[in-house]
């Protein structure tokens, strides 16, 4: 897989960078694994906006993805690599030996025609799923379960992988993409390898219209609003926000405020907290 650059024929193509979709082999999704899904557009059950800047975009059909990998011991053949409009990762269409079809997240390096299998006795190969107790130390895994049998909940985005650091007792230490080291039960399943389509981090939309196609509406700075709409609003001309630090539209501190509870029960499983990715001062860009 590679990325594709464009010549500046128009302002929208000047900075446009996209993936070339060379790894995608299937044109249409498997009809038995596609369902319709109502788009919430950032609203809750009462119709109130709970997530701003959402709405519009191209219509989508949801692909049912198998995050559990619970067909143990049954080999499956990779029939095609499909595009998924709901995520950056690609999907691998599996044809199982018993005739069932399922989608999984396409691991990096998995090719059409390759066979994968899940279970505690699965071989150590990319795309195979097994308990963390059977994964060798230092291996990269993705689609990691937090609770056994619930399905993969962590490390599912394109290009992501976690590293098995240590095993002790009933737990396995994983180094997550955020650099956090966390304990996970040894019976939880994970898939070997990293998620494919890692080059997506190098892409650029190029124009505002492509962001609208994805269902993202414009973000307006609070400093250009009226005081009735945002705490940063008001003043004459380009006035400062008039506060010691930026706040949300509802007056709560923004940009750097930790929202995780100090006494959260799962803190006991975090061996090392994630490192900070940026050092923004409290006088940074307002929300």
Curated annotation (Swiss-Prot):
Stretch list, region Disordered = 221-287
Q: Which GO terms describe its molecular function?
A: rRNA binding; structural constituent of ribosome; transferase activity
The Gene Ontology biological process annotation of the record reads: translation
What SMART domains does this protein's entry cite? Ribosomal_L2, Ribosomal_L2_C
Pfam families per the UniProt record, alphabetical? Ribosomal_L2 (PF00181), Ribosomal_L2_C (PF03947)
The record's SUPFAM superfamilies line, in alphabetical order, gives:
Nucleic acid-binding proteins (SSF50249), Translation proteins SH3-like domain (SSF50104)
* This protein's GO CC annotations: large ribosomal subunit
Q: Where is the composition biased (Basic residues)?
A: 258-287
Q: Which UniProt keywords apply?
A: Ribonucleoprotein, Ribosomal protein, RNA-binding, rRNA-binding
Protein family: Belongs to the universal ribosomal protein uL2 family.
Per UniProt, subunit arrangement is: Part of the 50S ribosomal subunit. Forms a bridge to the 30S subunit in the 70S ribosome.
| Purpose of the protein | One of the primary rRNA binding proteins. Required for association of the 30S and 50S subunits to form the 70S ribosome, for tRNA binding and peptide bond formation. It has been suggested to have peptidyltransferase activity; this is somewhat controversial. Makes several contacts with the 16S rRNA in the 70S ribosome.
Q: What is this protein called?
A: Large ribosomal subunit protein uL2
Native species = Parasynechococcus marenigrum (strain WH8102)
């Amino acid at each position: 897989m590679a990325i594709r650059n464009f010549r500046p024929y128009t302002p929208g193509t000047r900075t446009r960078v996209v993936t070339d979709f060379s790894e995608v082999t299937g044109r249409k999704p498997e009809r038995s694994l596609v369902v319709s899904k109502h788009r919430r557009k950032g609203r809750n059950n009462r119709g109130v906006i709970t997530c701003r800047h959402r709405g519009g975009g191209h219509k989508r059909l949801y692909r049912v993805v198998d995050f559990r990998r619970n067909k143990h011991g049954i080999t499956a053949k990779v029939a095609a690599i499909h595009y998924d409009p709901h995520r950056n990762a690609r999907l691998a269409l599996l044809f199982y030996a018993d005739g069932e079809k399922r989608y999984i997240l396409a691991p990096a390096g998995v090719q059409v025609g390759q066979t994968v299998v899940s279970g505690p006795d699965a071989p150590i190969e990319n795309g195979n799923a097994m308990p963390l107790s059977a994964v060798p130390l230092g291996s990269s895994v993705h689609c990691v379960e937090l609770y056994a049998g619930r399905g993969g909940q962590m490390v599912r985005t394109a290009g992501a992988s976690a590293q098995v650091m240590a095993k002790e007792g009933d737990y396995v230490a994983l180094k997550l993409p955020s650099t956090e080291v966390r304990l996970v039960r040894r019976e939880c399943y994970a898939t070997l390898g990293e998620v494919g389509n890692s080059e997506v981090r190098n892409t650029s939309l190029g124009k505002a219209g492509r962001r609208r196609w994805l269902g993202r509406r414009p973000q307006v700075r609070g400093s250009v609003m009226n005081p009735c709409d945002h705490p940063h609003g008001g003043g004459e001309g380009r006035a400062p926000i008039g506060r010691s630090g930026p706040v949300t539209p509802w007056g709560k501190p923004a940009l750097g405020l930790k929202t995780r509870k100090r006494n959260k029960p799962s803190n006991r499983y975090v061996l090392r907290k994630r490192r900070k990715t940026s050092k923004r001062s409290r006088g940074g860009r307002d929300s």
